[in-house]
Amino acid sequence: MGHVIIVGAGPAGVATAFLLAQRGLQVSLLEQETQFDRVFRGEGLMPSGVAALEEMGLADCLAGIPQRRLDAWDFYIDQHRRMRVVEPQGAPGQIPTHLIHQSALLKAIVERSQNLPNFQFYPGWQVQALVSEGDRLQGVKARCGGESRDFTGDL
């Protein structure tokens, strides 16, 4: 079984970690922050994002997460609204764009991943350097508080 080191528990990092661990690879997910509750950008979840979560088997992670339907986009210049574009709602049954609490979604996916025996989450670990031998990248050197450690893997 291969071992994968993933640096960063953003949307791509947590989704990749979950999928690889679900498929049997050993996964170590490192995140420099100790909590997910921080300011994020891009908290809009488009219909394709919801579809991707459904395909990964993570749609239920959306339940209970603060969210609201996006009705329109307002464009401001010099603090004056210049244009409003109504968000198309699509056909009945089509998923609309939602504004979500991204940190709650990331936390839910990590919690789901922690149910897998081959997944390890390392909050508070900040990557300092790459670890290599010859031409091969083997992992990362990371620090958490006063502790320093090498995380090595196959991929």
Please state what every model-predicted region is.
Residues 3, 26-28, 120:
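Structural signature of beta-strand start/N-cap positions in the alpha/beta core
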Residues 1-12:
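Beta1/beta-strand and adjacent pyrophosphate-binding region of the FAD-binding site
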Residues 21-41:
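Glycine-rich FAD pyrophosphate-binding loop
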Residues 14-15, 48:
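Short alpha-helical segment within the catalytic ATP-binding CA
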Residues 34-54:
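Conserved N-terminal glycine-rich FAD pyrophosphate-binding loop of Rossmann-like flavoproteins
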